[in-house]
């Protein structure tokens, strides 16, 4: 007999191995061609961080990523200054330049204060990321946060021109900052997950530290929304105590 068909048992195809740790999506960075395209300038960095965050994460791993990091920091400073001008319109006068300087400077200082702890937590978690890559991810966090704040700026300006409540304006800016921070931390978490870290415990701890540092920085650089006799405070306060004191301020009298 001429049997042209095999008689052996049918063997099912092998089950593909699970994705390696640090790649929750199952796709390593740079697998798609568009992720490997360079990001030439700050404008392209804004477009990439909003539409193609994986492209930013991949480029931060490549040699010569300093230009991208500088571009994202430039975007963060520029957007912070613009949003700070909007914040300063509530009180006017000196705050038109003081608020932008304090917001941009405070955000950068907070990031620099928290950068060493993030790198240490990354190393303890088994991450293979270089310090430059971690610094780039933090720059991306700041850029995305401030870009979102620019999106909220028209709403903040409207309320700053139509209300005299310092507590309400402070709460509104905190809400906008909180929303922007959530999205920024999502970007940072996604980038952190691609560094082969075995645990997120260190990253989650760092998030708490970063939020506390930024909140305390707003108190250390007060006043940002309102006005005071000096540009910087002469009294040390915890940010919660400062919020409580703001709520106790007398309400402004209604205009005739």
Where does each model-flagged region fall?
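Hydrophobic alpha-helical transmembrane segments and adjacent short intramembrane/lumenal linkers
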Residues: 101-105, 109, 118-228
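Long, solvent-exposed, polar/charged low-complexity segments
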Residues: 38-48, 52-57, 185-256
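Short amphipathic alpha-helical segments, especially helix-boundary/capping motifs
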Residues: 28-35, 93-98, 111-112, 133, ...
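N-terminal juxtamembrane cytosolic/stromal segments of multi-pass membrane proteins
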Residues: 2-69, 241-256
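Selected alpha-helical membrane-embedding segments in polytopic membrane proteins
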Residues: 39-129
